[in-house]
Amino acid sequence: MLTFLIPTAKEMTIPKESHPHLLPQDSQAILKIMAAMTTEDLAKAYRIKEEAAKKEQQRWQDMASQKSLAYPAYQLFNGLMYRHIKRDKLTTQEQAYLTQQVYITSSFYGIIPANHPIAEHRHDFHTRIKIEGQSLKSYWRPCYNQFAKEHPQVISLLSSEFDDVFSKDCKQLWISPKFMAEKEGQFKTHSTISKKARGAFLTACMENNCQTVDSLKSLVFAGFYYHPDLSTDHEFVYIKKEA
């Protein structure tokens, strides 16, 4: 069975379905630090203006006082990649695929199933804090490595910020899809192409119930197709021709 890892997103939208917020044990230490920070501290940690930091401070304090509601993560996150993932009117098989084979990597919650209930928050591995004297990446590395050992065949749709959260020896069977546009024989890639394509790729995997590495090679989605000559065992390249 294939396991997919996808990143979080800064952009969020509140879905209809809500749950009580139950925070994993490993996240408690992070919450304690974040909830105690001033708006000035948060502005520095996030590299944002203090006005924007006030909103984040309220979110952390609401979590600490157990006032926060939680929402299925794949519905709450609404960045460009998420908007290109099929999230509504799923078949029973697609719903099972999304909730059993797709996991979200978070610097606050750890690695969670796509439908895990989470609260509104802003947090990533660039957030400037120390947890028990460690960087966020060092703090989460044992948890992330354990997940990798339990799920050896991972399809990673993660961005570069996650490259050194996992230890290298845990990623021997990983495959990272790469998405490129071709125009007049020239190949190019950029953030917008990649984010949209990640969502479309995951949707195609769900719709086709892909369970093997070879099945990924026959996918055609949003104009992209697998390019064997540019691909390697660990990087599958998908090309979309532009006019």
From Swiss-Prot:
It comes from the Bacteria. GO terms for biological process: response to hydroperoxide. One of its GO terms (cellular component) is cytosol. Belongs to the UPF0246 family. PANTHER family: PEROXIDE STRESS RESISTANCE PROTEIN YAAA, PEROXIDE STRESS RESPONSE PROTEIN YAAA. This is UPF0246 protein SpyM3_1790. It comes from Streptococcus pyogenes serotype M3 (strain ATCC BAA-595 / MGAS315).
